[in-house]
């Protein structure tokens, strides 16, 4: 609760000081739109998901629109979007199973899966559209959503993980973890016994390795990912039952069938099939998802940190029609805000964290000042030293506002000056200590720092978790000192430090609150007091 109140207070302060257009008490939402991973083309817009947040690109005026709970969405952390031209509606699903339908008439929420206590695993693996119906592949079966009526039509509880679904004239097919199954559309699909195994005559892969199934040129197509990665690829079944390979590539990520095209891709290469014998290959730098709904020669790509990229085929050449929609000064890099602090009207955010163990989050440092974000590139630390993750705190040098120390729950303390990496402190070059040695663990990954702060003299104080001496200090002369307390010996969650005007250090942990007073003599421990 204290962290929530502290976070809200900091947000209010920064928004009050930097958002001149906002009236007092009016909130703004700052969501990350840094890495675009999902895309869906609609009539006049291209919708995309970046870091779990929805935005759109207007194809007519090139404007960007962002969507959030403030604009009517029911939830956050989006995992799928797909546009259904039959009903002119965007289907949005969230990682917790919640569902929104976005159309010109507004946003309609369907919380069937979210609220269903009988379904514990609410993972949605894929979505297939057939007229006004959307078939949601889940870890327990298939949910059929009528997008025109805005209601759940059916739930097929197959008691197995379903990766993908497709429908032809007479049958519905499902790629599951147990293999490929199918049923007649005229049968009672609610009855598990109506679903039968579908056999493929292929020595290349087993049907349990099919991750996506589709229909192209009236042929069943499969993205198979068998244990033998040399056979990963796109396959299709001819009318006589023969299974043929279309493309083998161990790096294939997805198969998309839209606009009478079969499209598959690796991280940086597109394969666009107009038929089983007519293929274009396009290099596109970064590809996370692709959509093509309106013009069969125009393709929209979810291109990571470049946002939305558009390409068009013209005279047998592919040209870029949209290079980049990202403006990284407008958004935080990630939706992580484990620790925040204000310094001279600048908001500093450490996007890491910890629980019973480390969270494994990339070292995320973000700044917000004068209406703009600066997102520090964690690779500058990773490349100069090693990978540093799980930032837990930030301390700003009182004598230099561009000089920071960032604590990490695993790698020690990172020193940054003028947005450049200066040093990484761990047990090899400081008094910081790794946790008690456990065979097989690299001590460089277990220098666990809970928080950092400066005192008024310019000494940097840090809490060191799961060690004998839980409190460390980097003095102004560049040397270190350590302090141990019986209550905090090997304490798991020694956390933040607050230094009061009388120079006492207040430190919180699961074991309680420690108050430490060094009497202003760091090197003389004879007069120290703690309780």
Task: List PLM regions with ranges.
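Bacterial Sec-dependent N-terminal signal peptides
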Residues: 1-26, 461
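Carboxylate-rich, polar loop motifs that coordinate divalent cations or form catalytic acidic clusters
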Residues: 20-531
